[in-house]
Regions:
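Sec-dependent N-terminal signal peptides
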Residues: 3-16
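Generic cytosolic/nucleocytoplasmic N-terminal low-complexity/intrinsically disordered segments
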Residues: 1-2, 46, 98, 110
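SH3-family beta-barrel domains
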Residues: 19-58, 67-71, 80-81, 111-119
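Generic marker of residues within folded, mature protein domains
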Residues: 6-8, 44, 81, 95
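SH3/SH3-like beta-barrel superfamily modules
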Residues: 20, 27, 66-108
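Short, solvent-exposed loop/turn positions at domain surfaces
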Residues: 62-64
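Basic side chains
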Residues: 2-3, 55
Length: 119
Protein backbone atom coordinates (compact mmCIF):
# COMPACT_ATOMS: atom_id res chain seq x y z
CA UNK A 1 0.00 0.00 0.00
CA UNK A 2 2.85 2.38 0.82
CA UNK A 3 4.29 1.78 -2.64
CA UNK A 4 0.98 2.71 -4.28
CA UNK A 5 0.77 5.93 -2.26
CA UNK A 6 4.39 6.74 -3.16
CA UNK A 7 3.78 6.11 -6.88
CA UNK A 8 0.61 8.22 -6.78
CA UNK A 9 2.49 11.09 -5.09
CA UNK A 10 5.27 10.88 -7.71
CA UNK A 11 2.74 11.07 -10.53
CA UNK A 12 1.06 14.10 -8.95
CA UNK A 13 4.38 15.89 -8.48
CA UNK A 14 5.37 15.24 -12.12
CA UNK A 15 2.03 16.66 -13.29
CA UNK A 16 2.50 19.67 -11.03
CA UNK A 17 6.06 20.20 -12.33
CA UNK A 18 4.90 20.00 -15.97
CA UNK A 19 2.14 22.54 -15.35
CA UNK A 20 4.62 24.86 -13.61
CA UNK A 21 7.15 24.56 -16.46
CA UNK A 22 4.44 25.25 -19.05
CA UNK A 23 3.38 28.37 -17.13
CA UNK A 24 7.00 29.54 -16.92
CA UNK A 25 7.66 28.85 -20.61
CA UNK A 26 4.47 30.71 -21.58
CA UNK A 27 5.75 33.75 -19.65
CA UNK A 28 9.15 33.58 -21.37
CA UNK A 29 7.56 33.23 -24.82
CA UNK A 30 5.20 36.13 -24.13
CA UNK A 31 8.12 38.34 -23.14
CA UNK A 32 10.52 37.35 -25.94
CA UNK A 33 8.29 36.35 -28.86
CA UNK A 34 7.93 38.37 -32.06
CA UNK A 35 4.60 40.23 -32.02
CA UNK A 36 2.43 40.24 -35.17
CA UNK A 37 -0.35 42.41 -33.78
CA UNK A 38 -3.50 41.37 -35.66
CA UNK A 39 -2.04 41.66 -39.14
CA UNK A 40 -2.34 38.12 -40.45
CA UNK A 41 -4.83 35.30 -40.61
CA UNK A 42 -3.67 31.72 -41.08
CA UNK A 43 -5.44 28.54 -42.18
CA UNK A 44 -4.75 25.00 -41.00
CA UNK A 45 -3.25 22.83 -43.75
CA UNK A 46 -3.36 19.05 -43.86
CA UNK A 47 -5.39 16.10 -45.02
CA UNK A 48 -8.79 15.02 -43.73
CA UNK A 49 -8.47 13.76 -40.18
CA UNK A 50 -5.47 15.97 -39.36
CA UNK A 51 -5.58 17.90 -36.09
CA UNK A 52 -3.49 20.89 -35.07
CA UNK A 53 -3.45 20.88 -31.28
CA UNK A 54 -3.38 23.91 -29.01
CA UNK A 55 -0.67 24.09 -26.34
CA UNK A 56 -0.60 26.16 -23.14
CA UNK A 57 3.03 27.06 -23.95
CA UNK A 58 5.24 26.51 -27.02
CA UNK A 59 6.31 22.94 -26.17
CA UNK A 60 5.14 19.40 -26.91
CA UNK A 61 4.90 18.85 -23.15
CA UNK A 62 2.21 21.53 -22.90
CA UNK A 63 -0.26 19.99 -25.38
CA UNK A 64 -3.95 20.46 -24.61
CA UNK A 65 -5.17 16.97 -25.53
CA UNK A 66 -8.79 17.83 -26.33
CA UNK A 67 -8.29 21.25 -27.91
CA UNK A 68 -7.53 21.24 -31.62
CA UNK A 69 -8.53 22.67 -34.98
CA UNK A 70 -8.77 20.95 -38.35
CA UNK A 71 -7.85 21.74 -41.97
CA UNK A 72 -9.44 24.90 -43.38
CA UNK A 73 -10.09 26.37 -39.91
CA UNK A 74 -8.73 29.93 -39.71
CA UNK A 75 -7.00 31.72 -36.86
CA UNK A 76 -5.58 35.14 -36.12
CA UNK A 77 -1.91 34.98 -35.14
CA UNK A 78 -0.54 37.41 -32.58
CA UNK A 79 2.96 36.18 -31.83
CA UNK A 80 5.77 33.94 -33.05
CA UNK A 81 8.31 32.09 -30.88
CA UNK A 82 10.98 29.50 -31.66
CA UNK A 83 11.45 26.65 -29.16
CA UNK A 84 12.52 23.00 -29.43
CA UNK A 85 13.81 23.66 -32.99
CA UNK A 86 10.28 24.53 -34.00
CA UNK A 87 8.38 27.71 -34.81
CA UNK A 88 5.26 28.31 -32.73
CA UNK A 89 2.47 30.86 -33.10
CA UNK A 90 0.16 32.23 -30.44
CA UNK A 91 -3.27 32.31 -32.09
CA UNK A 92 -6.97 32.81 -31.49
CA UNK A 93 -9.63 30.65 -33.12
CA UNK A 94 -13.27 31.79 -33.14
CA UNK A 95 -15.86 29.07 -33.79
CA UNK A 96 -19.17 29.51 -35.62
CA UNK A 97 -20.93 30.32 -32.32
CA UNK A 98 -18.49 33.12 -31.49
CA UNK A 99 -16.58 31.17 -28.82
CA UNK A 100 -12.85 31.83 -28.89
CA UNK A 101 -9.90 29.60 -28.04
CA UNK A 102 -6.35 30.91 -27.70
CA UNK A 103 -3.05 29.10 -27.38
CA UNK A 104 0.21 28.08 -28.98
CA UNK A 105 0.21 26.01 -32.19
CA UNK A 106 2.95 24.68 -34.46
CA UNK A 107 3.54 27.17 -37.29
CA UNK A 108 4.25 24.34 -39.76
CA UNK A 109 0.56 23.34 -39.60
CA UNK A 110 -0.56 26.67 -41.13
CA UNK A 111 -0.36 28.85 -44.21
CA UNK A 112 -0.95 32.60 -44.43
CA UNK A 113 -4.48 33.11 -45.71
CA UNK A 114 -4.93 36.85 -45.48
CA UNK A 115 -4.00 40.18 -44.08
CA UNK A 116 -6.17 41.68 -41.36
CA UNK A 117 -4.83 45.24 -41.35
CA UNK A 118 -3.01 47.43 -43.88
CA UNK A 119 0.15 47.88 -41.74
Amino acid sequence: MKKLVFIFCCILSIDSYAAHSCDRLAQIADKHGVMYGTKYSFTVIGKKGFRSYFHSAPSEQCKLKNTFIIPNDSVIAYQDFKHENQDWMYVMYIDKNGNDTSGWVKAKDFKVSGRMSPN
